[in-house]
Amino acid sequence: NSKGIVSLTSLTSDIIYTLKPEALIGIPGSSILRKNESLKNIPTISEGRTPPNIEKIISLNPKLVIGSEGFHDKTLTKLNELGIDVLSTKVNSWDDLTSLVENISTITNENSQKVFEKLNSCFIEASPKNKKVVVLVSTKPLLSPNDKSWAGSLLERFNLKNLTADLEGSGRMKGYLNLSPEWLIKEEPDNLILIRFGDEQYNEYKNLPFWNDLKAVKNNKINYFDYYGLINVGSLNSINKTCEKLESL
């Protein structure tokens, strides 16, 4: 008799655990969940970037497996063929997030308010900000999110004018595009938001030949954000911290 839910993403694990801890019976082995002591006794069904372990998932006898569209398609299709219910999710906007929370609340028969309380910084009335911003995710290429991405959606929610909002995404990632140095210099963003991965990352920006020609750099308007929360949703806590930080820009 199957009972619980196996979650293949850190965000859905966090949402399920917040709503109904006993419903969560399998989680991904992600760095962001390892920080959460209360999850340490829940079996992990994947490590790092390796695909989830199908045998292990089946052995947990879940009534539902929740994964991420684009990342877990193969796993979910396979489980579905084996007669296990699956749910494929995507969070490319604030609306996607709220519908996901409502959906999982219905599945667990719990009140979605429990989750939204952990996102209180995202529900404050955003102050008007007259700032043109550009988010840079990497130096080679100069990758930046448009309004079809989670990051773009959050910038809009906090009244920040994302200069790349309406630009066409490149390649498979509809929500991201490659910028040219010329474009960046011409558009003159007031603030540059740089994404933290490891230490090497920041120094790379300083080495770009055009870096010191940028208005935001001259005015020292550089804001460092974590990858989790702004680029990858990560967890409820990482989203809440990102909202808090965007409001303070």
Region spans (language model):
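Structured C-terminal subdomain patch of bacterial secreted/periplasmic proteins
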Residues: K3-G4, L8, L60, D95-S112, ...
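Basic- and aromatic-lined ligand-binding clefts that recognize polyanionic substrates
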Residues: K3-L19, N111-N159
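His/Asp/Glu-enriched short active-site or ligand-binding loop at hydrolase and phosphoryl-transfer sites
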Residues: P28, A151-M173, L194, Y224-D226
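Short helix-initiation/N-cap motifs at beta->coil->alpha
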Residues: I45-E55, G169-E182
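Extracytoplasmic ligand-binding site segments that recognize negatively charged/polar headgroups
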Residues: K74, K90-S105, L136-L154, E200
